[in-house]
Every structure is written in structure tokens, then in C-alpha cells.
């Protein structure tokens, strides 16, 4: 079900289409930029500091992304387009644009596949989703997201430096989407690294039928 890869790397989701994939298709970003949407791993916390218990021996988090720059992992260069609303992207492209929506059902299994390009020891993956009634005309902020992740998939080995060979990035993994969701939502997926202060951020636009 969850297939680990021997060498652990920087990376991006290649299936299904993320916001990064769409930006690459539109010629706004290169794959290498989507591979490096990394920011502090303690999100949704606001500040840098130790990774929460029981994994305090992991490298401490650098500052997590600021509101409005969450989906790009805090990047404010060309990768800021990942944070754009439909209106902002329409202005950027000089044509009408809506982020493409992946059709899903509440409670279904949502599978992702990664392509990794630089080695890291993996603590795990964290999934977050927008609140009911969130405003698509505003950039994603902490206030737009549910307060707690709807799923976390962490390796439990401690300390990481004694188990690095076991804590492998997963090329394929999956999550059960929350029940009770309807309509348009944004999902944030974080690949959390044990031996740096960062996580790698990926975002998906979903339409719950």
C-alpha cells in the first residue's frame, strides 16, 4: 500500500495534479522549483523551534510559512503563484483562470505518487484541509484551514539518526479524505523531514461531490 523508496530526496507529487503541476503546465514554474517548495515543518505553528513530542530529537523547525504563502512553503519568488487565487492567476496569465478541481467524494481514499530528487530522512506526512465556508477569493491562511491536520503518517523510530535507513520517503501513499465535506476545498500535504528544519509543501484543489 505504502511503498518506500531507498534514497530519500527533495521532491514533488506527480500524481494527481497539484497546484505545482498546473503551474508547470502553464509555463510559470519549472519542476525544480516545485521540488523545492520547502518551509518550516512545524506548520500550522507560527514560530520556529523544537519539533513536537515525542520527536524532539529531530532537527528543530525553521520559521513556518506565513499566512498567504502557505501553499508555496513560504516561497515568495516565482513560486508565489501557487498561493494565487483564481483572480490573481487570471491577472498573471492575462486570461480567465480557475484552479482545476480534482473530483472526489468525502471519505474516499486519495492516493498520491511522489518523485524525489534529493536525499533526506523522513519523519512523515501531514495532511490539512480548508474549513467549511472558507473563501476561495482569499489566499490560504491558517484561519482558512481546519485547526488540526486530518491525518498524520509518521515514522515512530527515535532518535532518527539511529534509524535513518528505516525512515524512507514513500513514493506512493494514501489518505482517507474527511467525511462531511462538500464542494471546493484545498488540501495541503507536507512531507516532513527529520534531519532538517523543513517540510516540503504540496497543494491540491478538490471538488467534493
Model regions and ranges:
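Exoplasmic/lumenal beta-rich domain surfaces
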Residues: 132-172
Amino acid at each position: 500500500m505504502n511503498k518506500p523508496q531507498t534514497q530519500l530526496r527533495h521532491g514533488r507529487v506527480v500524481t494527481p495534479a497539484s497546484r505545482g503541476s498546473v503551474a508547470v503546465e502553464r509555463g510559470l514554474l519549472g519542476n525544480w522549483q516545485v521540488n523545492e517548495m520547502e518551509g518550516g515543518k512545524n506548520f500550522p505553528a507560527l514560530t520556529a523551534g523544537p519539533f513536537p513530542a515525542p520527536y524532539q530529537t529531530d532537527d528543530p523547525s525553521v520559521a513556518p510559512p506565513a499566512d498567504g504563502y502557505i501553499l508555496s512553503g513560504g516561497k515568495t519568488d516565482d513560486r508565489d503563484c501557487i498561493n494565487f487565487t483564481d483572480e490573481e492567476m487570471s491577472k498573471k496569465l492575462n486570461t480567465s483562470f480557475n484552479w482545476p478541481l480534482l473530483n472526489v467524494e468525502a471519505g474516499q481514499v486519495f492516493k498520491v505518487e511522489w518523485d524525489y530528487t534529493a536525499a533526506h530522512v523522513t519523519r512523515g506526512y501531514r495532511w490539512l484541509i480548508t474549513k467549511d465556508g472558507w473563501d476561495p477569493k482569499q489566499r490560504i491562511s491558517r484561519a482558512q484551514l481546519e485547526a488540526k491536520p486530518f491525518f498524520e503518517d509518521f515514522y515512530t523510530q527515535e532518535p532518527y539518526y539511529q534509524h535513518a535507513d528505516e525512515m524512507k520517503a514513500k513514493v506512493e501513499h494514501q489518505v482517507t479524505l474527511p467525511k462531511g465535506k462538500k464542494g471546493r476545498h484545498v488540501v495541503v500535504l507536507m512531507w516532513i523531514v527529520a534531519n532538517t528544519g523543513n517540510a516540503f509543501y504540496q497543494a491540491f484543489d478538490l471538488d467534493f461531490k
